Amino acid sequence: MIFTRERFKCHQGVMPIPCPHFKITIVKRSQGQSAVAGAAYQSGERLFSEYDQKTKFYNKKKELVHAEIMLPSHAPPGYADRATLWNAVEAVENQWNSQLARRIVLAFPVEVPKEQYLKMIREFCQEQFVAKGMIADFAIHDKGDGNPHAHILLTIRAMDEHGKWLPKARKDHDL
């Protein structure tokens, strides 16, 4: 199953279904944003930011269904820890106006059974991002109000085969 801006496709013979919401933004330090705070928000975890020495925690988030980090095979295993990953990202992006991460929010069509959400988002992240060397931190949220959705936080930099951050690509990724 592949999400795109317009729709996702089920490869088991189901007709393409429109994706009701798909938004991509950049987490920017110049706008007072933080990758650590974004990760804390979507995962519901309490995370300490080494950049501003503050704990980030959003205790009102009751709709978390699942949160997971997907790493390329050559990424350091320590990056499976959310605080370690996003603090490392914020350390390597050390300018006042750094772009820290890509944030994607997408809604699941109500026609799709809840049991398929995790499989769909894992396939999407693997094919579109992890296979290209990026790290994907995703969370599925569902309050039961008819708005099931996923948050994906992506590293801007990909990793090389030795687990080192590559320079920022001066090309558009095919998102």
Where are these regions (language model features)?
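N-terminal nicking endonuclease/strand-transfer module with a His-rich metal-binding environment
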Residues: 1-175
